[in-house]
């Protein structure tokens, strides 16, 4: 089965704690969930989704709880698959909850500890996202160095011109910084 991670919301931008998706605890221990999440990788095909929702707005980040959502249950809806310029091997969509009932068994960890869980996943994920960028940059740098040695202008390789050397040096400095 394929899973997904649902933290981002249409209006929250980079502030993940500014979420509006709410989970209201019921007398029987279940939660009724309402709200939207956006840019959910594997959302169009996921059977299970780890969802983060506000259970206590007064507590900020400590009022966010994680849930394991079964997309086959009533109250869960998928939006259209979003067009993307890259990383098209994994489909992305918006998801919506309308009176989705999550049982107490669907809570991951403890009530209010969801954001701590999300942060741990995000920290590891950021390395995974940055790594391909560094690899692509390394390849671009090598290609640029080869090109400036080969391409000639005014009878000499363009790599002999000071402005080109400065651009290549800047590229190398930025690449070295990214690799750290």
Protein language model features and the residues they cover:
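Glycine-rich beta->alpha junctions and the first turn(s) of the following alpha-helix
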Residues: 76-177
């Amino acid at each position: 089965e394929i899973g997904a991670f649902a933290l981002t919301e249409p209006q929250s931008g980079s502030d993940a704690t500014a979420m509006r998706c709410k989970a209201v605890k019921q007398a029987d221990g279940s939660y009724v969930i309402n709200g939207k999440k956006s840019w959910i990788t594997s959302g169009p095909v996921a059977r299970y989704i780890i969802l983060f929702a506000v259970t206590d707005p007064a507590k900020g980040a400590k009022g966010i709880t994680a849930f394991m959502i079964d997309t086959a249950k009533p109250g869960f809806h998928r939006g259209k698959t979003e067009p993307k310029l890259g990383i098209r091997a994994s489909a992305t969509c918006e998801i919506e909850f309308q009176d989705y009932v999550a049982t107490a068994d669907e809570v991951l960890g403890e009530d209010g500890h969801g954001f701590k869980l999300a942060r741990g996943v995000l920290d590891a994920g950021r390395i995974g996202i940055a790594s391909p960028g560094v690899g692509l940059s390394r390849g671009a740098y090598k290609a640029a160095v080869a090109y400036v040695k080969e391409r000639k202008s005014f009878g000499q390789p363009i790599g002999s011109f000071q402005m080109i050397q400065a651009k290549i040096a800047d590229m190398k400095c930025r690449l070295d910084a990214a690799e750290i």
